[in-house]
Amino acid sequence: MALVTLQVSSLDVGSNITPVQDDEKSRRKRMQRRQSFVMVKGAALLLQDEGEPIDTREPLSSSGPNEQQIHLQSMLRLLREEDTLTLAVRLEPVRSCLTRYLLVVSSTGKSNVEETLLLGVDFPHDGSLCCTIGTVLPIWSNTQVFLDGDGGFTVTSGMDIRTFKPISVQTMWSLLQMLHKACESALSNNVISSSLYSGLIYYQSNRSSPQVCLNAWTASPDIESARRDPATPEREETERIIKLKLRDILRESDLENITSKEVRSALEQHTLCALQDYKEFIDNEMIIILAQMDRPSEIFPYLYLGSEWNASNLEELQKNKVSHILNVTREIDNFFPELFMYLNIRVLDEENTNLMQYWKETHAFITTARHQGSRVLVHCKMGVSRSASTVIAYAMKEYEWTLETAIRHVKERRSIVQPNAGFMRQLQTYQGILGASKQRHSYLWDPSSAPSLPLMSPPPKNFSSPTTSPLTPRLQKMNLRTLMRSISEMEAADTISEEKESTVVLEETTLKQNFNVLESSSNNLQVTPKRNEHVLSKEQIIQEEKKVMELEKGPEWVVKNNVLEEMKETEERELPNFELPMSLNQSRERDQETIKESSVITQGSSSLDEVFESSTPTRSPEMASYACQKIQYFEQHSEGYSKVCFVDNLQSVSEEEKVTLVSKQLQTDEHGERKARITRQQNVIDTHEEL
């Protein structure tokens, strides 16, 4: 471990800079600022912030700066003035890129929020004094870090996935700590993925690493099929000639009888050179060409569905005018990143893979290629499950098709399509999401957008209903707000009904107690007939009723109304005194005795004083009508009286029914007495008018 202080300036320290303007002086002053780093093997950690006063005396070194210090000084030159290099970590070499660093760069944005970027830097060789930017990866709130094992980890930022592998455990631990701190800061500040960092565009526009290094930064550890690194110009030319001749030979030969050695001999005759060193290359190319003979399937005029072999066939891609390639694999590399626009969906062909979360981006990617007038190739390993599911989802959304229609359309053009069970469930869910999205403007959710119903003219007067069954009227859709209100009312009604049930139970308990008291007291009561209540005999009442009906001038309903009131009076006068007849025959005998007594009493003339002193009714038309109706009423309701009379004796009647009958009678006592007094006064007035 060592402490290193570096001057953030150009390497031309010995050149004389003449300040001409004030801004030039300030710029030179800024460039003379220094930064201190803690240097360990393969890593450099910032020790103090720039702008902090430090000792300007540099330590003397007879050997000069080492390789790591030279690399650090070169990397500082790539940064903007407002950016700070927080950590620099050396990574393991990949392919021909031997010297690679990952830089953690931070700065303060316009909103005073700390912005963090990851820069991948390439050096042509160890002693090089210059470096280039190979990749740029921003740290957002949705950025995640996953450990891959063997000291490597993967960083996902939006749709970008990058894999890094530091050269030691110590450097890996330092880098993971710094990444965790940056991710937590972005999450707390809610730095969304759509926000643009001030330095993001600047560094992306200055990516200048060789294509081999660019491919190494985008490589995935799970890649099984990768593109070959370019070789020497002479070997590249020979391989290009082999590809062209090999395709022609395989197209013209009988593939069932020709061998690999015969193919190589035919190539040597065409190239006029020995191809002993190219045997492995020739075998690989033969397999690729045989696989590429299965052309990609044209699902739509602008969309092809194929396999990894179709994605590696440059001639076929250019012939089909493909400009965009959608790679829905984790194990297949991008073969021509410098020629085509790529979108990588790094997923595996497993049932638990969440592929639906990427369908919004894939739809936008395919739509962009279509609007540009070009074509897009969607591929996975074999063009059967992952890429096919993505194309089916695109067709469902773009053309508003059902899942069944989209699958049938794709299978008609590529019969081997077969999404796995997990992707099929996601497609069914996606169909429901699209269906719900279509209804977002429906008046079920927005009542103001409901179409006005046409007014129907009334049917003609002479319209007669047809003999056949009428058409069922169309049910109107219920408004969502009305539906929710009705649900709330139903809940309130349930609460009220529960309260009523509890009240009824309480009332029944109280009535049972009252009934027990009444039952004990009713046994001591003696039934005494009222001597002042008299009625006419049945024969006299019928005769007088006929005469009265002939002489009546008023409406019949008035007379009946009076009769009903008198009937209620008689009933209510008998019940409070518990004058309950034991049977219907006894009740009739008592009525007959009363009629006989009344006939004897009414033979004499009654004066006005006698009328007021006695409540005996006279033979007026109203009273005669009342008496007649009274007899009819007793005959019709005799069954009801019998039930009241035998309340204590009938064993079949339950205790609850007894309580109900007695409670009803008690409630009508007071009301009946008031009505009886009013009716007597009315009868007296009528008698006075007749006299």
From Swiss-Prot:
Coiled coil: 532-580
Domain of life: Eukaryota
Gene Ontology cellular component list: cleavage furrow; cytoplasm; cytoskeleton; midbody
Biased composition (Polar residues): 597-619
Positions of region (Disordered): 585-620
GO biological process, one term: negative regulation of actin filament polymerization
Keywords: Actin-binding, Coiled coil, Cytoplasm, Cytoskeleton, Hydrolase, Protein phosphatase
List of catalytic residues: 380 (phosphocysteine intermediate)
Enzyme Commission code(s) on record: 3.1.3.16, 3.1.3.48
GO molecular function, one term: protein serine/threonine phosphatase activity
DEK-C domain location: 236-291
Known outcome of mutating residue 380 to S: Abrogates phosphatase activity
Transmembrane segments: none
Reactions the enzyme catalyzes: O-phospho-L-tyrosyl-[protein] + H2O = L-tyrosyl-[protein] + phosphate; O-phospho-L-seryl-[protein] + H2O = L-seryl-[protein] + phosphate; O-phospho-L-threonyl-[protein] + H2O = L-threonyl-[protein] + phosphate
Function: Protein phosphatase which regulates actin filament dynamics. Dephosphorylates and activates the actin binding/depolymerizing factor cofilin, which subsequently binds to actin filaments and stimulates their disassembly. Required for completion of the gastrulation movement and for cytokinesis.
Family listed: Belongs to the protein-tyrosine phosphatase family.
Other remarks in the entry: Tyrosine phosphatase activity has not been demonstrated for this protein to date.
Record text on subunit structure and interactions: Interacts with actin and this stimulates phosphatase activity.
Protein name in UniProt: Protein phosphatase Slingshot homolog
Organism: Xenopus laevis
Lineage of source species: Eukaryota, Metazoa, Chordata, Craniata, Vertebrata
